[in-house]
Structure formats: structure tokens, C-alpha cells
């Protein structure tokens, strides 16, 4: 009889724990009645990683497995392109940036390409074999000028179209999982394990390390429109700097929804809304600085992790936005 009661107690305990855990990970938000996103299919198994336009209509998307596609209608449709690269190299094209007709591509392993005719032709540039890390981010700074950051936190600049590169930091930051550059020329990076982050302000030549704000490992960091930082951490935590100019001062953690998936990116749309994207089609927005959130109905239907949100607001009348997913999934901002 005692064994019977013991087994019954264990069953009840397991059921109670299961119910409690399910309550922790299935919270839901209201679903928005409409979506400003239009789904596009790139018809590829590759993951799109970055997008840039040379003008209002003409642009490129790049990604894994040598993915490069071209659009001539503002990103409504895309056609496959190819680059003159070794057939046996499976390049990961991770960053692209245009300023008018001049464009740059950074890829892994050890790839930087340059175009001066809006991407009709691309030339591969030679890089030093001892370059710390692999190219991670390329930024167009004007005619023949660009800045290259590696996944080890090394920063290089060229002023002659990529013929020569000059280091701008005295030593690399170490292996990073995420690295971003602000419009003002500042950098922020997340260590490979997510246990700290580093900043490099314009004019500095040494990275400054900062402790994470909680026990949760940092997933990604970036810049708000006002130049302050935002942080996404494991456990679906979102934080914003709450003191101007103080990168170590963070507001209370926002956890809009706990569905078992981490957020991977955060971005501000042209109307001031804040968007968070993450695993299993997670795409949510807030219109009141995080006080309340809604699930986007279009993102919720995507059979993909949503890994990056990009907005280009340089032209107020023709603002562009994209959410990049996996296996060719792409959402286009239609406002």
C-alpha cells in the first residue's frame, strides 16, 4: 500500500512540475491585426545574411554557400548572380555595403571584394595571410575608402580602393560572436561565449571590456537610433541603456514573451517602432518603448529562425526594411 501511495505521489508531483514548467514557457502576446511585412521566397537553401542597395531600386543580398542575388525593383524580386571565385571554396558572404556605384563584400574565409560599377563586376582583393580572424563587417566610407572588421575584433581601413590596409587598433579584441558599427564610427562586440562585451569609440585604438549586466549570457548588442546601446541576452531578455553616454548603465530587463526561443536581433523601424526577431519565426514589436508588445502575424507563419532585421532610413520617402531568415526566407517591409 505504501508503494502505491508513493507511486501516486510521484505521478502527481511530475504532473505538477510539468504544468508549472509549461506555464513558464508558453506565455502569449496579442497578435497584431495586420502586418507591415511581405514574405518573399528566394528559392534557395542558403541563409541570407546582409543586404545593401546602390540606389532606390538596385541592390544585392548575400549569404551562406556563396549566395548573391540582385534586385532591380527595390527588393520586391531577386535573381541569382554569381561571383568569379574558386569552385571548391564554400564562401560565406557575410557583409555587403554600397555607397552609390561603389560596393564592398566581406566573406569567409579571407574574402574581400570591390566593385566600382554598382556590382556589375567584382574584383577580389588580396589580404595578408596573418590577418587576425576572418572578415566579418565591411563599411563603405566614400570613394576608395572602407573599413573592415574581423571576427577577432581587428579593424583595418583602406583609402586606395583596397590595395593597402592599415590597422586602426593596437590589438584585436579576441573571438567575437557579434560585432556592430554605429553611424558615428563606434564599434561594439560580444565575446564568443557571451560572458562580456567590448566597445571601441571613434579615435580609440584599444577595446574596452565591460561585464554583462546579469547572469544571462549576451546574445547580441547594437545601437539605438540615439547612439545608445541595446542588448539581447539569453532567456529572451531585452535591455536598453538608461543613462546617456554610460554603456554600463542598463534599464530593467524586458521579457515580452517566453516561448523557449532566444531573440537574435533588435531594430527600430522608420515610424519609431521597435522590433525583436528570434527563433522559430519569433517577430514582435512595441510602439510604446517596451511597455506593451504584439506578435507580428506574418513572422509567426515563417518556418524559420529570424536572424536579422535591417532598416535603411537614409531616404525618408523610400525607407527599406528586411527580416532575414534561414533557407531563403525573407520578409520585406511594406509599411
Swiss-Prot record:
A single Gene Ontology CC term: thylakoid lumen
UniProt keyword list: Lipoprotein, Membrane, Palmitate, Photosynthesis, Photosystem II, Signal, Thylakoid
Subunit text: Part of early PSII assembly complexes which includes D1 (psbA) and PsbI; not found in mature PSII. Binds to the lumenal side of PSII complexes. Interacts with YidC.
Lipidation residue positions, type S-diacylglycerol cysteine: 24
GO biological process: photosynthesis
Similarity field: Belongs to the Ycf48 family.
Source species: Prochlorococcus marinus (strain MIT 9313)
Entry domain remark: A 7-bladed beta-propeller torus, about 55 by 55 Angstroms, with a depth of about 25 Angstroms and a central pore.
Endpoints of the signal sequence: 1-23
Gene designation per UniProt: ycf48
Compartments, as annotated in UniProt: Cellular thylakoid membrane
Keyword Thylakoid: yes
Matching HAMAP family: Ycf48
Keyword Lipoprotein annotated: yes
Superkingdom as given in the UniProt entry: Bacteria
Protein name: Photosystem II assembly lipoprotein Ycf48
Function: A factor required for optimal assembly of photosystem II (PSII), acting in the early stages of PSII assembly. Also plays a role in replacement of photodamaged D1 (psbA). Assists YidC in synthesis of chlorophyll-binding proteins.
Topology versus the membrane: Lipid-anchor
Main location: membrane
Residues lipid-modified (N-palmitoyl cysteine): 24
Amino acid at each position: 500500500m505504501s508503494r502505491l501511495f508513493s507511486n501516486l505521489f510521484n505521478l502527481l508531483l511530475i504532473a505538477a512540475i510539468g504544468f508549472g514548467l509549461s506555464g513558464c514557457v508558453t506565455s502569449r502576446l496579442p497578435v497584431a491585426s495586420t502586418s507591415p511585412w511581405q514574405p518573399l521566397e528566394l528559392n534557395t537553401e542558403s541563409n541570407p545574411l546582409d543586404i545593401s542597395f546602390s540606389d532606390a531600386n538596385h541592390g544585392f543580398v548575400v549569404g551562406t554557400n556563396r549566395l548573391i542575388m540582385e534586385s532591380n525593383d527595390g527588393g520586391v524580386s531577386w535573381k541569382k548572380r554569381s561571383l568569379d571565385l574558386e569552385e571548391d571554396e564554400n564562401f560565406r558572404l557575410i557583409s555587403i555595403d554600397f555607397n552609390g556605384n561603389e560596393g564592398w563584400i566581406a566573406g569567409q574565409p579571407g574574402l574581400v571584394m570591390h566593385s566600382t560599377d554598382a556590382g556589375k563586376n567584382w574584383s577580389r582583393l588580396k589580404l595578408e595571410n596573418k590577418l587576425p580572424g576572418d572578415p566579418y563587417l565591411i563599411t563603405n566610407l566614400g570613394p576608395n575608402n572602407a573599413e573592415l572588421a574581423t571576427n577577432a575584433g581587428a579593424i583595418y581601413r583602406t583609402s586606395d580602393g583596397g590595395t593597402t590596409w592599415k590597422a586602426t587598433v593596437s590589438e584585436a579584441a579576441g573571438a567575437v560572436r557579434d560585432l556592430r558599427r554605429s553611424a558615428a564610427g563606434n564599434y561594439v562586440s560580444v565575446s564568443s561565449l557571451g560572458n562580456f562585451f567590448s566597445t571601441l569609440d571613434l579615435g580609440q585604438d584599444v577595446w574596452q571590456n565591460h561585464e554583462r549586466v546579469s547572469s544571462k549570457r549576451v546574445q547580441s548588442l547594437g545601437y539605438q537610433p540615439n547612439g545608445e546601446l541595446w542588448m539581447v541576452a539569453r532567456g529572451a531578455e531585452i535591455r536598453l541603456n538608461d543613462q546617456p553616454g554610460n554603456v554600463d548603465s542598463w534599464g530593467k530587463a524586458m521579457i515580452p514573451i517566453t516561448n523557449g526561443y532566444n531573440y537574435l536581433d533588435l531594430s527600430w523601424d522608420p515610424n519609431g517602432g521597435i522590433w525583436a526577431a528570434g527563433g522559430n519565426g519569433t517577430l514582435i514589436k512595441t510602439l510604446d518603448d517596451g511597455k506593451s508588445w504584439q506578435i507580428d502575424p506574418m513572422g509567426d507563419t515563417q518556418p524559420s529562425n529570424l536572424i536579422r532585421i535591417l532598416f535603411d532610413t537614409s531616404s525618408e520617402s523610400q525607407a527599406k526594411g528586411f527580416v532575414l531568415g534561414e533557407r531563403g526566407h525573407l520578409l520585406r517591409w511594406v509599411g
